[in-house]
Amino acid sequence: MPTKNQLIRHGREEKRRTDRTRALDQCPQKQGVCPRVSTRTPKKPNSAPRKIAKVRLSNRHDIFAHIPGEGHNSQEHSMVLIRGGRVKDSPGVKFHCIRGVKDLLGIPDRRRGRSKYGAEKPKSI
């Protein structure tokens, strides 16, 4: 317990908050190249393989990013745009690829939640 005099001389030091998405450098998105695209099994109660891309960002950080939605065309040397947002059942995956931007195509024929998957508006008949 500090004395009043010690507090006057030095004050209290605020705790520093850790940045969960340090690789983004305070940016909303970053662009990168995929050196590897693979699948990874999730944590315990879940079992479906998660599509994961290793991405080398434009600031030379190497990260793992989740590719959302069913099916994708991403392969080696694809350019992708990355946003924050972790995958709860995949340890170490703290980013998402944005569908419908750069080389990663959106999902065709998707009708609901289209903006999250880069899907075109369907033609009304």
Curated annotation (Swiss-Prot):
SUPFAM superfamilies: Nucleic acid-binding proteins. The keyword DNA-binding does not apply. Keywords: Mitochondrion, Ribonucleoprotein, Ribosomal protein. PROSITE patterns: RIBOSOMAL_S12. InterPro entries: NA-bd_OB-fold, Ribosomal_uS12, Ribosomal_uS12_bac. The keyword Ribosomal protein applies. Its main location: mitochondrion. One of its GO terms (biological process) is translation. CDD domains: Ribosomal_S12. It is found in: Mitochondrion. One of its GO terms (molecular function) is structural constituent of ribosome. Signal peptide: none annotated. Residues 1-51 are annotated as: Disordered. Pfam families: Ribosom_S12_S23. Residues 10-23 have a biased composition (Basic and acidic residues). One of its GO terms (cellular component) is mitochondrion. Protein S12 is involved in the translation initiation step. Belongs to the universal ribosomal protein uS12 family. This is Small ribosomal subunit protein uS12m. It comes from Nicotiana sylvestris.
